[in-house]
């Protein structure tokens, strides 16, 4: 039985779990290492020392010189051995060049991925322009209804009185008059209306601001109109005479 990483019996330290980015980088590094080893093993010892023509062209495309030496660095911060063969130098330069060209995968950078998707999904808004007054509309139906105000076209006719309308919903509201139906009721006074827009106009009458009540002063006390009715109904009693 094997214990998880960095865990012991009775220990409360959570196990060390590598992140998704670390796993991806390890997989990519392993694949690159296998590819480079296969490439170098296919060459003979003489070709490794002098590098073949195909390998030299490929290294030139990566801006790597097979005979160059690594850049010196401090011994305290460097993880490169002091004595390195030409093959190790070549390995290091190829891996550093390949890793420098690697970008962050799309699943590790969701913000950039969302920006790309939003740019693709965003479509230009359609505009419908009236040929009479150049007014813009976002829907073709609204443009068609608007153009009837210029042409005075009324395709919807009432079978009872013969009156014509530009819109079908206007004809529907008009038919309530002949049927003596008033489906739209006022919630405040209960009055009925045939058309909803007429009910909306009626509702505004209930919200009219009431006039300010009259006030008057009696001595140093301020009274309103309702208080004056009480004063008239019940005369004041002089307590000094009791």
Swiss-Prot record:
Chief location of this protein within or outside the cell: nucleus
GO CC, one annotated term: nucleus
Taxonomic classification: Eukaryota, Metazoa, Ecdysozoa, Nematoda, Chromadorea
Lipoprotein listed as a keyword: no
Keyword list, A-Z: Developmental protein, DNA-binding, Metal-binding, Nucleus, Repeat, Transcription, Transcription regulation, Zinc, Zinc-finger
Annotated function: May function as transcription regulator. Essential for larval development. Required for morphogenesis and function of the digestive tract.
Keyword Transcription regulation: yes
Gene disruption: observed consequences: RNAi-mediated knockdown results in defects in feeding, and failed growth and development eventually leading to lethality at the larval stage of development. Morphological and functional defects around the pharyngeal intestinal valve and intestine boundary with multiple cavities surrounding the isthmus of the pharynx in 1 to 2 day old larvae, and accumulation of ingested bacteria in the anterior intestine.
Gene Ontology molecular functions: DNA-binding transcription factor activity, RNA polymerase II-specific; RNA polymerase II transcription regulatory region sequence-specific DNA binding; zinc ion binding
Name of the molecule in the record: Protein odd-skipped-related 1
Pfam family, one: zf-C2H2
Family per similarity comment: Belongs to the Odd C2H2-type zinc-finger protein family.
InterPro entries in UniProt: C2H2-ZF_Transcription_Reg (IPR050717), Znf_C2H2_sf (IPR036236), Znf_C2H2_type (IPR013087)
Zinc finger (C2H2-type): 128-150, 156-178, 184-207
Protein location: Nucleus
